[in-house]
Amino acid sequence: MAGGSTGERPFSDIITSIRYWVIHSITIPSLFIAGWLFVSTGLAYDVFGTPRPNEYFTQERTQIPLVNDRFNAKQELEDLL
């Protein structure tokens, strides 16, 4: 091995190999499709607790739910809900 070499396979060898592209031609589109399904089915809203676009404003509350005092934020949030 040459000085300073970590013994790892060179990146140029990896990306020019058939094995690399066989594996990644499956995994990259699969990750894209999984992400698209995660968002389009609404599961992302449920997992992260984010309100859906039609849930930001209710019939009773038509203004922005804004917290003004960070020291009393819990009380302000309870009042907003």
Curated annotation (Swiss-Prot):
Q: Extract the coiled-coil ranges from the record.
A: none
Top-rank lineage group of the source organism: Eukaryota
> How does this protein lie in the membrane?
Single-pass membrane protein
Q: Locate the residues binding heme.
A: 24
How are cofactors bound according to the entry's free-text note? With its partner (PsbF) binds heme. PSII binds additional chlorophylls, carotenoids and specific lipids.
Q: Where in the cell is it found?
A: Plastid, Chloroplast thylakoid membrane
Give the transmembrane ranges: 22-36
Q: Which terms does the record give in the GO molecular function aspect? A: electron transfer activity; heme binding; iron ion binding
What cofactor requirement does the entry state? heme b
Extract one GO BP annotation from the record. photosynthetic electron transport chain
The protein's UniProt keywords, in alphabetical order, are: Chloroplast, Electron transport, Heme, Iron, Membrane, Metal-binding, Photosynthesis, Photosystem II, Plastid, Thylakoid, Transmembrane, Transmembrane helix, Transport
Question: Which HAMAP family does the protein's record reference?
Answer: PSII_PsbE (MF_00642)
Q: How does it assemble?
A: Heterodimer of an alpha subunit and a beta subunit. PSII is composed of 1 copy each of membrane proteins PsbA, PsbB, PsbC, PsbD, PsbE, PsbF, PsbH, PsbI, PsbJ, PsbK, PsbL, PsbM, PsbT, PsbX, PsbY, PsbZ, Psb30/Ycf12, at least 3 peripheral proteins of the oxygen-evolving complex and a large number of cofactors. It forms dimeric complexes.
The UniProt entry's sequence similarity note says: Belongs to the PsbE/PsbF family.
Name it. Cytochrome b559 subunit alpha
Q: Which gene encodes it?
A: psbE
